[in-house]
């Protein structure tokens, strides 16, 4: 798997001051309304590759965007700080180097925010794809007449996983990606489709019970 970022985002004109293994970004034209960011700059040994994969997964789970190889960014909030400090600690435990930066972007911040939106849209697209698969599976069960409680339970588990996946993406979605509402609506449609399938399962069960009763001694 390639852990390099797809498109770098440039943060420029920053002055760095060193303090206790962390850098603080000081921007000359500071504005109180300016959004603040954490930027983690790290380097790991080339081998084994699983170390890089582990850090990449941790940062990706937090919703970080890679500005370039070994440079990741998150909004400077409590969630972002926990994720960045945890990743930095893991890098050091893997005999790598890590510097955590906190500050403001001077220019091009819209591109940085846009990169977060693109990353979340890609994840929402995966949710939408799984929703289509979910509907297709229910249609296959209907066509085969498999209106059983076993099939219902299996599809309920799939829907629970789909809902949990959506919630994880929503937690990473700091800026309201364009596809968010579409993904929520798609998961809701899956739930409604499952309820309709459940009604068919109950109807089939009731019909089977009635048939057994009428054919009894």
Indicate residue ranges for each PLM-predicted region.
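Positively charged, polar, low-complexity stretches
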Residues: 10, 14-142, 164-167, 171, ...
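Helix-loop elements that line ligand-binding/catalytic pockets
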Residues: 113-117, 148-153
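Alpha-helix boundary/N-cap detector
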Residues: 122, 126-129, 150, 157, ...
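Non-catalytic alpha-helical scaffolds and adjoining flexible linkers that form interface surfaces
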Residues: 139-140, 144, 151-155
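Glycine-rich, aromatic-bearing surface loops/beta-hairpins
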Residues: 159-217
């Amino acid at each position: 798997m390639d852990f390099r970022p797809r498109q770098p985002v440039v943060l420029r004109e920053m002055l760095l001051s060193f303090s206790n293994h962390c850098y603080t970004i000081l921007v000359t034209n500071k504005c109180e309304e300016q959004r603040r960011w954490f930027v983690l700059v790290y380097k790991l040994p080339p081998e084994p590759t699983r170390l890089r994969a582990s850090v990449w997964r941790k940062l990706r789970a937090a919703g970080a965007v890679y500005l370039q190889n070994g440079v990741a960014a998150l909004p400077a909030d409590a969630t972002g700080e926990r994720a960045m400090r945890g990743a930095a600690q893991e890098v050091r435990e893997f005999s790598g180097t890590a510097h955590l930066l906190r500050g403001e972007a001077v220019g091009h911040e819209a591109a940085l925010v846009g990169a977060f939106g693109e990353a979340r849209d890609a994840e929402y697209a995966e949710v939408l794809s799984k929703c289509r698969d979910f509907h297709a599976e229910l249609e296959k069960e209907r066509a085969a007449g498999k209106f059983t409680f076993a099939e219902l339970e299996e599809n309920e588990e799939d829907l629970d996983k789909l809902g949990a996946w959506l919630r994880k993406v929503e937690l990473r979605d700091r800026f309201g990606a364009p596809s968010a509402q579409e993904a929520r609506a798609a998961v809701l449609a899956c739930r409604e489709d499952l309820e309709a399938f459940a009604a068919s399962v109950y109807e089939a069960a009731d019909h089977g019970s009635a048939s057994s009763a009428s054919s009894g001694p």
